Amino acid sequence: MYAAFLGLGMSVAILGPTFQDLAENVNRNISSLSLIFVGRATGFLSGTMIGGVLFDHINQFFLLGASMVATAAGLYLIPFCKTAVLLIITMSVFGASVGVVDTGANVLILDLWGDKGAPQMQALHFSFALGAFLAPLLAKLAWGTAPAQNHTESDLDTLMLNRSSNGTSDSVFAVPDDMNLLWAYASIGTFILVVSVFLFGLFCKKHSRQKKPRASAEGARRAKYHRALLCLLFLFFFFYVGAEITYGSYIFSFATTHVGMEESEAAGLNSIFWGTFAACRGLAIFFATFLQPGTMIVLSNIGSLVSCFFLVLFDKSPLCLWIATSVYGASMAATFPSGISWIEQYTTLTGKSAAFFVIGSALGDMAIPAVIGILQGHYPDLPVVLYTCLGSAIFTAILFPVMYKLATLPLKREDQKALPTSSRL
């Protein structure tokens, strides 16, 4: 499962450093192609909901193996798409298979280790972050194209116009002009395909279904404002995941067009973000043994606020961009798992409430990068990406104390008596 999530991290993060290459491959500029984020997130959301149902009726290893094969197929097909519509559709199918794997891996960890699986769960998400760290290196350093000239958004528009008028625009599915783009996606797809073989091997070996360890009704807890708390956490994850994906996906393009970095430098910057993210997510496994989840969230919010403030203040400084990106990646690492651990201290999570969080994060993944892509096209001279991350950091920093206040309000005695018989969300 760790290898599967390693491949998953690479497959998701590869979009950032290859975004401009994909845009050139379909003769579009970056702002007009931002809908691929919507397509991928919509597919992910659908796959998450479908996977949650299927894992109760189909062997988990078989479904995971089949989803990994579908993920690999999507990675193989993406570089061959020569129109934006076909690319968005392919990205949607790819996102659906990723959503099934994401849901299934988390469910499988809970099935195997139950409430004692916190280290395994942290290690699973650390594997994802490690894959996201390796993706830019693989894209631009291992299979990287020759360093290109830095272009503004208007330069890219002219370049796309010339390519579409000189090239053959009739084909919708063809070998890409840039073979390095093909090899970058194909290498990750091959790794995922190999992992799927081992999952099918486990399916053949284990025919019996594992028993799902569930918390007993005696240990159930319910906060006084349970539903309001879930809605606020939905918003919290919406902005947190949206900012994380936006920065990880657009920092490469931002560094080359706004700051004037070379492609190899920008790829290194992208790797620094995901590298500090992965390293601190690994360290969070040990910090969680002596720090409360709420404390880790507060520290993460402070780090995000400070780093985003300096990013906006010195948006043209390469040195500040390197340092603040490192701090921002480190600050974002522990927020998501700490948020889940924190709310479990005050109210018991059911399958429905967990799915609610996933929907919030998926919608943030879908909406915020797409909106930022459109805004960046209209205001190419403004650091829209940095403004968005700062706004999200301010919002989550204000929202968490409100959530904490709601969670710690005392529960009435009659509500506590009625809790064991309640089966609502």
From Swiss-Prot:
Membrane-spanning ranges: 35-55, 61-81, 84-104, 123-143, 183-203, 228-248, 271-291, 294-314, 320-340, 355-375, 382-402
SUPFAM superfamilies, sorted: MFS general substrate transporter
Subcellular location, principal: membrane
Keywords per UniProt: Cell membrane, Ion transport, Membrane, Sodium, Sodium transport, Sugar transport, Symport, Transmembrane, Transmembrane helix, Transport
Subcellular location field: Apical cell membrane
Function, as annotated: May function as a sodium-dependent glucose transporter. Potential channels for urea in the inner medulla of kidney.
Annotated family: Belongs to the major facilitator superfamily.
Record protein name field: Sodium-dependent glucose transporter 1A
Native source species: Mus musculus (Mouse)
Name of the gene encoding the protein in the UniProt record: Mfsd4b1
